């Protein structure tokens, strides 16, 4: 009886160890997947920042203009991609809100607001990056100016939407702001 109990206990312990090992392997695979994804993102950002550094170098006047334009194009594209999903999501949720509170005009205003913040942030951020070689505070100014653009956009857009639509749009705007700040953080 005692031997069978010990065998049973041994089997239970063995099964627990195997289950734990399988779980650890799953966690490791997920961790590796995430790290690989992050590494790719970091490599992309390193290349992106290398181009910005190249563009802002004081002794490369001939190449500066074209490299800076390329950086500006990339920054604008990134922001537009971030915004595109948010605008589409807002449009998809239109049916959840009363038509008079959240109509096509409102959606158009939101889209225009996003384009406005993109244009303001790109021009301000690029200017500060291009000046950073002669001003150590250039990148901080870029982030500050981009923050102003985001804050202006959120304030202006919220003011133009009726209250019940604002409540539904808040999460989307907060997500946009978070992603925008994360973009700045990864590129400062």
Segments the model singles out, each with a brief description of its role:
Residues 1-18:
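Classical Sec-dependent N-terminal signal peptides that target proteins to the secretory pathway
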Residues 17-188:
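Domain-level marker for long, solvent-exposed, non-transmembrane regions
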């Amino acid at each position: 009886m005692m031997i069978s109990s010990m065998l049973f206990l041994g089997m239970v312990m063995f099964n627990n160890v195997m289950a734990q090992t399988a779980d650890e392997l799953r966690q490791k695979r997920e961790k590796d997947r995430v790290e690989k994804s992050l590494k790719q993102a970091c490599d992309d950002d390193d290349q992106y920042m290398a181009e910005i550094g190249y563009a802002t170098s004081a002794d490369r006047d001939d190449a500066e203009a074209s490299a800076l334009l390329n950086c500006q194009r990339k920054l604008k594209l990134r922001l537009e991609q971030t915004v595109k999903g948010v605008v589409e999501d807002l449009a998809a949720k239109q049916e959840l809100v009363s038509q008079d509170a959240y109509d096509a005009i409102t959606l158009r205003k939101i889209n225009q607001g996003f384009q406005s913040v993109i244009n303001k942030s790109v021009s301000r951020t690029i200017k500060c990056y291009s000046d950073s070689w002669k001003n150590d505070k250039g990148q901080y100014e870029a982030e500050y100016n981009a923050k102003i653009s985001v804050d202006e956009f959120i304030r202006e857009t919220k003011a133009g939407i009726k209250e019940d639509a604002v409540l539904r749009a808040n999460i989307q705007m907060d997500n946009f702001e978070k992603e925008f700040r994360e973009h700045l953080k990864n590129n400062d």
